Amino acid sequence: MADTGLLTELAAEADAFVHSVGLLLDRESGLGGVNFITSGSRSVPAEGATYDTVMRDSAAALAAAAQSGATGGAERPLVYVSAAEAAWCESEGGQKLEAALPEFLGRYLSAKREAEALLQASSGLRVVLARPSLMYDWSKLDVLPLLPIVNPASALGERYGGGLGLLSKMLRVHVVGAAVVAALEAPEARGAKPICPHLPASPSISLHLTTSPCISRGARRALARRA
């Protein structure tokens, strides 16, 4: 999203916005060269591409473009596809689990949270923060082996609680996509409120919304300056 002029031009013609740009392995992780294995688009991050530039700064650019095209009428919706694990910082168990992650995954979640906070502070937009966990389809062989492990563990967590309750079920990409569309079309979808559209032949999905209360003080100050 480096071409802000083009982005602003396209935003002026849009009724709604979805930000789903992301990467699991950035350049600073030292694993960027194998990001194509986890990427749905088989992408390899460019030199200098970090979680902050790809997931946070691009969200800021989209919000700015959307705001510049506002006509003073109804707020246009913007859905940001975040991550369920961004909520880990809101519980003691989640904080412990996050502390055990590799450093680069901690930076991944921090970038998601900072993007969420930045978007929530944007005026003139109805911001929805969609928080699915791992997504899959039958063509992505890298993530499919996790399916028979994660989903049963998540189901046990829902029933009995404990640490397994922090695991969110893996969802098929089209289920998340349909839920995002439903959030765009639901004028009441905003802020700290779950949206649970029931999709035909699909499990229900909760898109948990938050104001990202657990980003660092330094990040809060930086975001305030941006706003």
Question: Where are the regions a protein language model picked out?
Answer:
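Short, small-residue-rich loop/turn micro-motifs
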Residues: 22-23, 82-85
